[in-house]
Design a protein with these regions (language model features):
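Interfacial juxtamembrane loops and adjacent helix segments
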Residues: 23-106
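Transmembrane-helix signature of polytopic, membrane-embedded enzymes
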Residues: 96-99, 120-143
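Transmembrane-helix motifs of polytopic, lipid-linked glycan transferases
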Residues: 100-127, 166
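Specific aromatic-rich, kink-prone transmembrane helix
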Residues: 119, 159-179, 192-193, 387-388
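Short acidic/glycine- and proline-prone juxtamembrane loop motifs at membrane-interface regions
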Residues: 146-160
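Perimembrane helix-loop-helix junctions
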Residues: 176, 206-242, 330
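Membrane-interface alpha helices of multi-pass inner-membrane proteins
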Residues: 184-201, 206-212
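Membrane-lumen/periplasm interface segments of multi-pass, membrane-embedded glycan/lipid transferases
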Residues: 247-332
């Protein structure tokens, strides 16, 4: 992991600019352009300058950096950036060299990864008590390059994955404990939805497979029907998240002289692609679901962070995919702690969620007449990976040797071949 690599050409620059503004006590609006500090760090890392004064060595024109200098993450609420802003306030010397500043910002992801591990633990203990299978599934999830990469640069993607995993844990907890009172169901649902909506609304994508799994398990897998209050909690989380997100967007629009569409026309300047061309871009995205976001460019580095995965990492990914498919074929795939949820149904629901995002993301741009840039929607699907990790549990319970192979192989890959 190279903590001092250049910033990604797409999102890390505005994410960092947002962080710096938040640390200074302000909120990014559509009028804002990149600060001199952001421009300096980005340029100095790109040219690998060895000058410790490079960041403030000269005055830089924001319009020289795509897209015309706009700090375009104004659509994001500040919650997901708070860990990075806190690090900037407490530990980072603003006058320090570019390497030390970016290293300390990115190192916040170590703490976020530990929070994700805690959220994942809360999720997996809801469905199984078998430690070996849980350890194998945890290894598969932790080494997924699409997920792990979200914790390697300055972005709100990592906090969004933590929030979506915790949300999944809460909803599955609700399926297990059907006697929760209405207040203990509704109040947390409203709070969770509001927080996720103000963190990153795309984290709410986990609601789709959970809803499908809850409905289909009762209908097709001889499972008990979830209580009405559980259905209401899922709906309230989604509704509260949507309301919070739209309210924040309206607040930012009111504070800005420019609007979202003006800035978007600079980011996505060409319009519209033909349906066939847009579909080809989606085919390229499919490869990225397995190999990570650097696959389409045959690049040495990911767009978002890590080096392109080695053949051993890809081989381990194939092992995880095989376990996923085997679980879908087992006759008995109920989770031991929650028989009401069938792993086969959950697996199919996760696949439906992946495909829905794969289609919905470009379709939205296509319908609006915007040019679809060659970036992956995989980062929006990453919150579904922990749910996919639950699906492999029946395979590892049935084939214990396979579970040991996943654990030992995963540790070897992480230590020597990643």
């Amino acid at each position: 992991m190279d903590w001092e690599r250049p910033l990604t050409i797409y999102d890390e620059v505005p994410h960092i600019d947002y962080t710096f503004r938040l640390a200074d006590g302000s909120i990014t609006t559509w009028d804002d352009v990149y600060s001199q500090r952001t421009l300096g760090i980005a340029e100095c890392l790109e040219i690998a300058s060895d000058n410790p004064q490079c960041v403030y060595g000269e005055l830089r024109n924001p319009q020289d950096r795509w897209p015309n200098g706009y700090s375009y993450e104004a659509l994001q609420a500040p919650i997901g950036y708070l860990p990075f802003a806190l690090a900037d306030i407490v530990t980072i010397d603003e006058q320090g060299d570019h390497y030390s500043q970016i290293r300390q910002l990115r190192f916040v992801n170590v703490g976020l990864w530990l929070l994700f591990a805690a959220a994942w633990t809360l999720l997996i203990v809801q469905v199984t008590s078998h430690r070996l299978a849980a350890a194998a599934a945890s290894t598969i999830v932790a080494l997924n390059p699409l997920l792990f990469d979200r914790f390697t640069y300055v972005t709100n993607d990592g906090p969004a994955i933590i929030a979506s995993t915790a949300t999944s844990a809460w909803l599955i907890f609700g399926l297990r404990h059907r006697t929760l009172s209405w207040p203990r169901t509704i109040i947390p649902a409203l709070a969770i939805g509001t927080i996720v909506g103000l963190l990153k609304p795309t984290a709410l994508i986990v609601l789709l497979p959970i809803l499908l799994a809850g409905w289909a398990s009762a209908r097709f897998a001889d499972s008990r029907r979830p209580p009405m209050r559980w259905w209401l909690s899922v709906i309230l989380i989604g509704a509260a998240g949507a309301v919070a997100s739209f309210a924040y967007s309206a607040y930012i629009e009111a504070r800005s002289s420019l609007d979202f569409h003006t800035v978007l026309s600079v980011i996505l300047p060409r319009g519209p692609l033909g349906l066939a061309d847009a579909s080809v871009l989606r085919l390229e995205d499919i490869s990225e679901l397995v190999t990570g976001s650097g696959a389409r460019n045959d690049a040495v580095t990911f767009e978002w962070g890590l080096r392109s995965p080695t053949v051993w990492v890809l081989g381990f990914a194939v092992l995880g995919a095989a376990a996923f498919l085997v679980s879908l074929t087992l006759r008995s795939a109920a989770f031991d702690r929650i028989p009401a949820l069938d792993a086969r149904v959950l697996g199919i629901s996760v696949v439906v969620g992946f495909i829905a995002v794969l289609i919905a993301h470009p379709a939205l741009h296509y319908v609006r007449g915007e040019f679809l840039m060659p970036f992956t929607s995989g980062r929006f699907q990453a919150p579904l990976i922990p749910l996919a990790g639950l699906v492999v549990l029946p395979a590892f319970l049935r084939f214990r040797g396979w579970a040991w192979a996943a654990i030992v192989g995963g540790l070897l890959v992480a230590a020597f071949a990643s």
